[in-house]
C-alpha cells in the first residue's frame, strides 16, 4: 500500500501523460493533460475521437505509457512507466470525470472532446532522489508491491 501511496502523491503533482496504443502492428503515442484518480488508479484525459490514437483505441484498447519530469541532473530523475487499458467513458461516468477534470483544468470547460479513462494495471516508479536506480512496482489485484 505504501508504494501506491508514494506513486499517487507524485502523480498528483504532475499533469502530462504520454500513452501509446497499437493496432494491427502499428504503434502511435500521444500526450495529454491528465487528472489522476488515486482511488481508481486511473488517469482521465480529453481527446477527440478523430485523432489517430483515438481511432486506433476504438472504444477500448491496451495501452502503455509514461509520466516524467524534466530534471537537468540524473540524481533528480523521477518517472512512471505503466501499462493498462484505455476506454472512452459514457453517460454519468463521463459527466463525473469531466467535472473533476474541469476543476483541475478550468480551460477544459471550453472543450467538447470525449473523456477517456486510462486504468493502470502495472506501474513502475523510478525515483533517483531515493538512490540511483531506486524503483517501486505496483500491480493491480496482486496484493504485491516491490520496492
From Swiss-Prot:
| Disulfide topology | none
Top-rank lineage group of the source organism: Bacteria
| InterPro entries referenced in this protein's UniProt entry, alphabetically | Split_barrel_FMN-bd (IPR012349), UPF0306 (IPR011194)
Q: Which family does it belong to?
A: Belongs to the UPF0306 family.
Name the record gives this protein: UPF0306 protein YhbP
- Look up and give the organism this protein is from: Escherichia coli O139:H28 (strain E24377A / ETEC)
Lineage at the top is:
Bacteria, Pseudomonadati, Pseudomonadota, Gammaproteobacteria, Enterobacterales
Gene name for this UniProt entry: yhbP
Amino acid at each position: 500500500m505504501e508504494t501506491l501511496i508514494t506513486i499517487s502523491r507524485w502523480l498528483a503533482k504532475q499533469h502530462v501523460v504520454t500513452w501509446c496504443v497499437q493496432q494491427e502492428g502499428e504503434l502511435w503515442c500521444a500526450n495529454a493533460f491528465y487528472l489522476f484518480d488515486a482511488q481508481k488508479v486511473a488517469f482521465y484525459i480529453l481527446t477527440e475521437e478523430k485523432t489517430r490514437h483515438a481511432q486506433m483505441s476504438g472504444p477500448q484498447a491496451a495501452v502503455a505509457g509514461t509520466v516524467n519530469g524534466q530534471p537537468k541532473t540524473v540524481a533528480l530523475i523521477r518517472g512512471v512507466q505503466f501499462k493498462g487499458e484505455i476506454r472512452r467513458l459514457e453517460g454519468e461516468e463521463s459527466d463525473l470525470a469531466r467535472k473533476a477534470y474541469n476543476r483541475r483544468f478550468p480551460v477544459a470547460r471550453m472543450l467538447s472532446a470525449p473523456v477517456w479513462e486510462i486504468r493502470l494495471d502495472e506501474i513502475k516508479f523510478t525515483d533517483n532522489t531515493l538512490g540511483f536506480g531506486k524503483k517501486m512496482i505496483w500491480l493491480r489485484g496482486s496484493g504485491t508491491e516491490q520496492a
